[in-house]
């Protein structure tokens, strides 16, 4: 059996550009792509923390070190500059890979879209 698992996540990225008339996609700083194990043309889901919008597109490379998160084409209508988004990708993982310790790449960034930390799991949520 295979399971559809979280593979990559960039958490709380600030939208830096919205380019309505650019070919559709999401340009992501190449440093963030690599840290999250995302590749160019990979399908990504984007969840807008500010307005609740959830949509899919594909990743393209943004200038390395720029902090760029550019929503392009129709995706530009789903956010405003400065909105915080979560960018995620999923993968089909078989039971053997899971048993061998397969883990996602979770990237946490600061206000300037620079990497401030990594994790390989989401902590248990508590009621405290």
From Swiss-Prot:
Post-translational modification: Is synthesized initially as an inactive proenzyme, which is activated by self-cleavage at a specific serine bond to produce a beta-subunit with a hydroxyl group at its C-terminus and an alpha-subunit with a pyruvoyl group at its N-terminus.
Protein residues bound to substrate: 57, 73-75
Cofactor binding, note field: Binds 1 pyruvoyl group covalently per subunit.
Catalysis performed (reactions): L-aspartate + H(+) = beta-alanine + CO2
Keywords of the record: Autocatalytic cleavage, Cytoplasm, Decarboxylase, Lyase, Pantothenate biosynthesis, Pyruvate, Schiff base, Zymogen
Any one GO molecular-function label of the UniProt entry: aspartate 1-decarboxylase activity
Key word Lyase present: yes
Enzyme Commission number(s) from the entry: 4.1.1.11
A Gene Ontology cellular-component term: cytosol
Entry's localization field: Cytoplasm
Cofactors that this protein relies on: pyruvate
Keyword Transmembrane: no
InterPro entries referenced in this protein's UniProt entry, alphabetically: Asp_de-COase-like_dom_sf, Asp_decarbox
Active site: 25, 58
Gene Ontology process terms (BP): alanine biosynthetic process; pantothenate biosynthetic process
Modified residues (Pyruvic acid (Ser)): 25
Biological pathway: Cofactor biosynthesis; (R)-pantothenate biosynthesis; beta-alanine from L-aspartate: step 1/1
Quaternary structure note: Heterooctamer of four alpha and four beta subunits.
Primary role: Catalyzes the pyruvoyl-dependent decarboxylation of aspartate to produce beta-alanine.
Family named by the database record: Belongs to the PanD family.
Name the record gives this protein: Aspartate 1-decarboxylase
């Amino acid at each position: 059996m295979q399971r559809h698992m979280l593979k990559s996540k960039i958490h709380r990225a600030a939208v830096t550009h919205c380019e309505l008339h650019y070919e559709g996609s999401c340009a992501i700083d190449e440093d963030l792509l690599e840290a999250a194990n995302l590749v160019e043309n990979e399908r990504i889901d984007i969840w807008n923390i500010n307005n609740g919008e959830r949509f899919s597109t594909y990743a393209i490379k943004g200038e390395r070190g720029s902090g760029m998160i550019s929503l392009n084409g129709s995706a530009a209508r789903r956010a405003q500059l400065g909105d915080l988004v979560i960018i995620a990708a999923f993968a089909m993982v078989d039971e053997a890979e899971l048993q061998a310790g397969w883990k996602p790449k979770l990237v946490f960034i600061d206000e300037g879209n620079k990497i401030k930390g990594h994790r390989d799991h989401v902590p248990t949520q508590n009621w405290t």
